[in-house]
Amino acid sequence: MCFSLPSINKEGYLFIVVSFIVTCIAFSISWGFGVTCLFPTLLCTYFFRDPARIIPGNKDLVLSPADGVISKIEEVSYPLSTNNGEEKKFTLVSIFLSVLNVHVNRIPISGTVKEMHYKKGKFVSAMSDRSSNENEKQVIVIEYTKGKEIIVEQIAGLIARRIVCNLRVSQSVKAGERFGIIRFGSRVNIYVPTDVEIRVSEGQTVVGGETIIANLNKENTQEKLTFDLV
């Protein structure tokens, strides 16, 4: 039997190393103190885990950008600079991430990054729907075909004060690729066109890069899937 350690996201290296050093010092002082310090070290390692995912390869599928639970699905309007600032209709799928979820974010669909905006704001608890409008966030607009966009928002929370996004405007992206992380509990919103088939429901648990959020081609209900391990 082969045993392998879980992959750790690079954003967690500093936290884990510092926690490990503190734990070693604590054990040198007393066994009980060391055990007490060991718990946050293990928790930190668990939080920054970055497991490989089996990515569906069909280009018509929109994948979940994050692990978590679907807290809301509703039709909304969203202003885009690529649309001269005018609002366009989208279906919002909001995903809540607890501190126990994998917090690595993944690209929902292949395309090109057309816009990126970092909006300053509050740090309301990510459990509240208010966080979508009031909290600090990173907005990413991905054009998957000419004139068609999907929007992803990485939203900070009460504990999550650090959003990491490793994308740039005009960058080509592939569905399922890692693109960032939000530290310690958060929310991720994805906005898809209103004319697509939504494949999830409120209260459903989703897995980033694996769970199908929507099908862009309603007529293709029997899509043939291929898979990649990423």
Curated annotation (Swiss-Prot):
Pathway: Phospholipid metabolism; phosphatidylethanolamine biosynthesis; phosphatidylethanolamine from CDP-diacylglycerol: step 2/2. The active site is at residue 186. It is a peripheral membrane protein. The record marks 185-186 as: Cleavage (non-hydrolytic). It holds the Pfam family PS_Dcarbxylase. The keyword Cell membrane applies. Its main location: membrane. One of its GO terms (cellular component) is plasma membrane. Binds 1 pyruvoyl group covalently per subunit. It catalyses: a 1,2-diacyl-sn-glycero-3-phospho-L-serine + H(+) = a 1,2-diacyl-sn-glycero-3-phosphoethanolamine + CO2. Its cofactor is pyruvate. It is found in: Cell membrane. One of its GO terms (molecular function) is phosphatidylserine decarboxylase activity. The keyword Manganese does not apply. One of its GO terms (biological process) is phosphatidylethanolamine biosynthetic process. Is synthesized initially as an inactive proenzyme. Formation of the active enzyme involves a self-maturation process in which the active site pyruvoyl group is generated from an internal serine residue via an autocatalytic post-translational modification. Two non-identical subunits are generated from the proenzyme in this reaction, and the pyruvate is formed at the N-terminus of the alpha chain, which is derived from the carboxyl end of the proenzyme. It is an enzyme of class 4 (lyase). Keywords: Cell membrane, Decarboxylase, Lipid biosynthesis, Lipid metabolism, Lyase, Membrane, Phospholipid biosynthesis, Phospholipid metabolism, Pyruvate, Zymogen. The modification Pyruvic acid (Ser) is found at residue 186. Belongs to the phosphatidylserine decarboxylase family. PSD-A subfamily. Heterodimer of a large membrane-associated beta subunit and a small pyruvoyl-containing alpha subunit. Catalyzes the formation of phosphatidylethanolamine (PtdEtn) from phosphatidylserine (PtdSer). PANTHER family: ARCHAETIDYLSERINE DECARBOXYLASE PROENZYME-RELATED. NCBIfam families: PRK05305.1-2, PRK05305.2-4, PRK05305.2-5. This is Phosphatidylserine decarboxylase proenzyme. The gene is psd.
